[in-house]
Structures are given as C-alpha cells and as structure tokens.
Curated annotation (Swiss-Prot):
GO terms for cellular component: HslUV protease complex; proteasome core complex. One of its GO terms (biological process) is proteolysis involved in protein catabolic process. This is ATP-dependent protease subunit HslV. It holds the Pfam family Proteasome. GO terms for molecular function: metal ion binding; threonine-type endopeptidase activity. It is found in: Cytoplasm. Protease subunit of a proteasome-like degradation complex believed to be a general protein degrading machinery. Belongs to the peptidase T1B family. HslV subfamily. The active site is at T6. The gene is hslV. Its main location: cytoplasm. Gene3D superfamilies: Glutamine Phosphoribosylpyrophosphate, subunit 1, domain 1 (3.60.20.10).
Length: 180
C-alpha cells in the first residue's frame, strides 16, 4: 500500500503570497484523515512551505530547507539559493535521495517548486501547484488569475475547491496561509 493524494498551490498577487493545501490523507483506497496540515510557516513566518508526499519525509525536508535558509552568515533570506542547495543535497545524499515528496516554498517575492530529482522550478506565472490534484488546481488558478478583483488567497482557495471536485485524493478541508 502507498500513501496518495494532496494538492498544494502557491499564488502571488498584489504583494501577497498565499499557499493552500487540502487536508486529505489517503492510504491505499482508504481516507485516513481529512484535516491534515500540509503547509508550514518557516523562518519566523517569512516563508511558506507546502508538501506533497510522505509526511515524515516532508518534515525532514522542511527542516533541511530552513537550515539552508538560515546558513547565510549575512542574515539575508534567499529562498532561491536555499532551494538549489536543498535540491543538490536531496539528489546526491544517499539518505535524502530516498525521500518521496515534493515541496513548494514561497516568500513575498518568489514561488519555487523543489523536487527530489534536483529540479528547482520558478513558474512564469505567479502560480504553481503540486500533488495529485495539482494540475486541476493549476488550471483553475490560471483562469482565476484573469479576474483582477480576486486576491492571491481567493484564487488559492477557489482553485483547491475545483481540484477537490475532480480529484478523489483531494478534499475541501483547506488550510491557507498568506504572507506579504
């Protein structure tokens, strides 16, 4: 049996960044939990991170990412540099290489996807999503982005609602965090 599921989305708009995730944890064909929290604030609330994949692996990756951000002696928060450093370690370290998860990290200026294959992707649009319902949420978000009246949080929330209607591994118990 394997764990499946999760949809996480990050949106930037109007000087604000929102990250949202559904709450469903599925094991095989069974929903084990409907209110899991898959996003976290890091570095005193200045960075948002979300994960898709194994929970224990994600916690390890959150900790490693935060270490990379804090490793700069000048105190500057550079999530791009930290993401590249984490991706290098994740790909080359024998223990980290076995971790099965994907991460989204975001601050007020950047949104990044980090994968275990060493990819660090910064989207062209200020939208990115991961997980089983990621493509549904992403498509919905691109459409919602055309409505200039919607905030980053509104778009993230509405996009996850769409994904929850289509993806059996995504529910509508949404946790949303926002920073500016």
């Amino acid at each position: 049996m394997s764990f499946k599921g999760t949809t996480v989305i990050a949106i930037r708009r109007g000087g604000k960044t929102a990250v949202a995730a559904d709450g469903q944890v599925t094991f095989g064909y069974t929903v084990l939990k409907s209110n899991a929290v898959k996003i976290r604030k890091l570095v005193n609330g200045r960075i948002l991170a979300g994960f898709a994949g194994s929970t224990s692996d994600a916690i390890t990756l959150f900790e490693k990412f935060e270490e990379k951000v804090k490793a700069r002696e000048d105190g500057i928060i550079d999530i791009k540099r930290a993401a590249v450093e984490l991706a290098k370690d994740w790909r080359s370290d024998k223990i980290l290489h076995k971790l099965e998860a994907m991460m989204l990290v975001a601050d007020s200026e950047n949104i990044l996807l980090i994968s275990g294959t060493g990819d660090v992707v910064e989207p062209e649009e200020d939208v990115i999503s991961i997980g089983s319902g990621g493509n549904y949420a992403y498509s919905a978000a691109l459409a919602y982005m055309e409505n200039k009246k919607l905030s980053a949080a509104d778009i993230a929330f509405k996009s996850l609602k769409v994904a929850a209607k289509v993806c059996i591994y995504t529910n509508s118990n949404i946790v949303l965090e926002e920073i500016s």
